[in-house]
């Protein structure tokens, strides 16, 4: 393989979900296209870190200091939906069933990967609860071992706050990922969320 193509394949194959075969196909596809298209793509990728920030309030991606969801006065400020990743916000907001606010933890507790509670945005969540009149916290974490561990940890901490803590209802398969759940299932899951007893956590 030509070194220039090999270099592109190597970089592309480091991306999640892209193996060497797909990276090779993408590299050759880019070569077939108009060079201007490749330059536009390269500029877009280069500008990502210059133009996209984390919302100072919820941690979602945005192009300013605060995201559109946090500044939307029509949203219910009494409910916060806690998610693992910024892309989960887009998925949940796209359902149309949920009209509250969000909070991105930035990951889940994963001891084998060296991720503990201190590496997550749990302290920021507690600060939000102290500074506002939130009545419900929805734990919308992926139903994996790490997601369940994190949900249990957050549930335990929230026992000290006067809030109802709920978890998404069934319909999301164990080990599933919110990013791949269809909107109808996610909407049913939101409507059927169940309260958690924080005193038993």
From Swiss-Prot:
Pfam families in alphabetical order: RecR_C (PF21175), RecR_HhH (PF21176), Toprim_4 (PF13662)
Xref: Gene3D superfamilies: 3.40.1360.10, 6.10.250.240, RecR Domain 1
Domain Toprim: 78-173
Keyword Heme on entry: no
BP GO annotations: DNA recombination; DNA repair
Family to which the UniProt record says this protein belongs: Belongs to the RecR family.
SUPFAM superfamilies hit by this protein: Recombination protein RecR
Keyword terms, alphabetized: DNA damage, DNA recombination, DNA repair, Metal-binding, Zinc, Zinc-finger
Zn finger (C4-type) start-end: 55-70
Organism of this sequence: Treponema pallidum (strain Nichols)
GO molecular-function terms, A-Z: DNA binding; zinc ion binding
CDD domains xrefs: TOPRIM_recR
HAMAP family, sorted: RecR
Protein name: Recombination protein RecR
Disulphide bridges: none
Presence of the UniProt keyword Metal-binding in the record: yes
Job of this protein: May play a role in DNA repair. It seems to be involved in an RecBC-independent recombinational process of DNA repair. It may act with RecF and RecO.
């Amino acid at each position: 393989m030509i070194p220039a193509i090999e270099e592109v394949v190597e970089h592309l194959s480091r991306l999640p979900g892209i193996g060497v075969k797909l990276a090779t196909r993408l590299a050759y596809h880019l070569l077939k296209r108009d060079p201007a298209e490749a330059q536009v793509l390269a500029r877009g990728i280069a500008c990502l870190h210059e133009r996209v920030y984390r919302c100072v309030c919820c941690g979602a991606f945005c192009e300013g200091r605060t995201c559109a969801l946090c500044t939307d006065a029509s949203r219910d400020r009494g409910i916060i939906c806690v998610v693992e990743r910024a892309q989960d916000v887009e998925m949940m907001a796209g359902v149309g069933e949920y009209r509250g606010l969000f909070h991105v933890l930035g990951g889940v507790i994963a001891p084998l990967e060296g991720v503990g509670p201190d590496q997550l945005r749990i302290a920021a969540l507690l600060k939000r609860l102290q500074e506002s009149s939130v009545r419900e916290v929805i734990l919308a974490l992926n139903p994996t071992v790490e997601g369940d561990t994190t949900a249990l940890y957050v549930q335990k901490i929230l026992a000290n706050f006067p809030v109802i803590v709920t978890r998404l209802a069934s319909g999301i398969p164990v080990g599933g990922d919110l990013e791949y759940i269809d909107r109808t299932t996610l909407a049913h899951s939101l409507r059927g969320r169940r309260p958690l007893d924080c005193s038993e956590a």
